[in-house]
Amino acid sequence: MQNQKIRIRLKAFDYRLIDQSAAEIVETAKRTGAIVKGPVPLPTRIQRFDVLRSPHVNKTSRDQFEIRTHQRLMDIVDPTDKTVDALMKLDLPAGVDVEIKLQ
């Protein structure tokens, strides 16, 4: 797997979960002898929703809700076969979305 790169992108609503998962991935990759670049924090995506409080009148009275999606990006340069096997066996929390691309 020489001259290849694994790009890992993590997404989660809770920044503590995503930082914990990123640290676990970095530790696993370094233990198997790969070079890790990152984690790089990407911009947080904020979705805002305005909802009327009243079912009938008072249009000016609203509740505001938001969902924040935190993202991290890391590159694993020159991964070995051990690195790939260790990453496949890694158990991450359920609230973290992981995208892995081989380049």
Swiss-Prot record:
Keywords: Ribonucleoprotein, Ribosomal protein
GO cellular component assignments: ribonucleoprotein complex; ribosome
Coiled-coil ranges from the UniProt annotation: none
One of the protein's GO biological processes: translation
Name of a matching Pfam family: Ribosomal_S10
Record-level Gene Ontology MF annotations: structural constituent of ribosome; tRNA binding
Domain of life: Bacteria
SMART domains assigned: Ribosomal_S10
Summary of the function given for this chain in its UniProt record: Involved in the binding of tRNA to the ribosomes.
NCBIfam families: PRK00596.1, rpsJ_bact
Subunit structure: Part of the 30S ribosomal subunit.
Protein family membership: Belongs to the universal ribosomal protein uS10 family.
PANTHER family: 30S RIBOSOMAL PROTEIN S10 FAMILY MEMBER
Protein name per UniProt: Small ribosomal subunit protein uS10
